[in-house]
Amino acid sequence: MSEHKTTEMLQEEAAKIWAGLEGKTLTNKDRFGIPQQEMPSQEPEVRAHNMSEVALGYTETQARVEAERCIQCPTAPCKKGCPVGVPIPEFIKHIQAGDFKGAIDTITTTNLLPAICGRVCPQEKQCQSHCTIGKMLKSPEKAVAIGRLERYVADWERANDKITVPTPKPDTGKKVAVIGSGPAGLTVAADIRREGHSVTVFEAFQKTGGVMVYEIGRAHV
């Protein structure tokens, strides 16, 4: 079993890599050589005594380094693997430029639940399975960590009070009922509201959230 690395250790490693990348015009060969950034997590001795989320999320430096691994493929095969069509190269390009607000705004054009999808989507079977970097390294687990980057900018938006609510189209006067307040139900409700319709969400249980509340568990989200 490999030694657990603290957030501080991973940040130090990322800072050394970033020092060699900052201000440099990178070739694809340079990008292939950047190691995937490991996700910081609670130390085993600590997480054994709590039910908090194990994964802690990238630091800003880690996110910048990881984003630089993306070679901005013209055909964007990663996007083809995303069920909701997130503009993946575009949001990663914003991260490369240090524009985290631009990154999250790009994601939310098609996905209003990036903090959830960044945590629980099976990226290794979807977007990352199509990533050119992953194919070059013969493993989707070594692809550009798209989900971790999505999570980073979603968490950054919340932590920095930068959340913006999409402006709906003019009211149509139509009313729509959505049954269930899980991720799917909330996504449908949000998309319908964006089109100008009035939406009421019905939930049978005491709390909203569906599988996020009743099945997945706090250790993962």
Identify the meaning behind each predicted range:
Residues 91, 183, 210-211, 216:
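Gly/Ser/Thr-rich helix-start
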Residues 174-201:
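N-terminal Rossmann-like FAD-binding beta1-loop-alpha1 element of flavoenzymes
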Residues 2-175, 205:
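Ferredoxin-type iron-sulfur electron-transfer modules and their immediate structural context
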Residues 197-213:
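Glycine-rich FAD pyrophosphate-binding loop
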Residues 150, 190-191, 211-214:
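Short acidic, glycine/serine/threonine-rich loops at helix termini
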Residues 219-221:
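Conserved small/polar residues in nucleotide/adenosyl-binding loops
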Residues 112, 182-184, 207:
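Residue-level detector of alpha-helix initiation sites
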Residues 126, 187, 210:
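Conserved SAM/SAH-binding loop-helix junction
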